[in-house]
Design a protein with these regions (language model features):
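Vicinal oxygen chelate
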Residues: 1-10, 20-114, 121-126
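Conserved beta-strand-loop-alpha-helix junction that forms the acyl-donor binding cleft
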Residues: 13-15
């Protein structure tokens, strides 16, 4: 039996408050926790449906991703990936791969948020 009780990604960004507002808006979620010290967010939790992830400001030992990207892609399965992608674009994200139907039975695309984190938005096709 696994000893894991919980798992979620923690995104490191420059400008956590702006990132939190972006994520809550584009994913239809809410910020359920926010702890700051000296004006820098140390930990904040975004909850959107069954998904949850943390956000924090970059700092000593926790650098934000560079413009070259990061080796992690967050995968979100949603009812309408086109609508989520559009909200992300409206908030300043950029398209890496447009939302389209794929031969493996998904409608999916990938975007980079304004802080460099990559998000795949998808739904399984019938």
């Amino acid at each position: 039996m696994s000893e894991i009780e919980q798992f979620y990604p923690r995104l490191v960004v420059e400008g956590a408050d702006a990132a939190l507002a972006f994520y809550a808006k584009v994913f239809g979620g809410e910020v359920t926790e926010r702890y700051a010290n000296d004006g820098r967010v140390q930990h904040a939790m975004v909850v959107a449906g069954p998904a949850r992830f943390a956000v924090k400001d970059a700092g000593d030992g926790d650098p934000a991703p560079s413009g070259g990207g990061i080796p992690v892609i967050m995968a979100l399965y949603v009812a309408d990936p086109d609508a989520v992608a559009q909200r992300m674009l409206d908030g300043g994200a950029r398209v890496l791969f447009p939302v389209t139907d794929h031969e493996y039975g998904e409608r999916a695309g990938r975007l980079a948020d304004p802080w460099g984190h990559q998000w795949m938005v998808a739904k399984r096709l019938p």
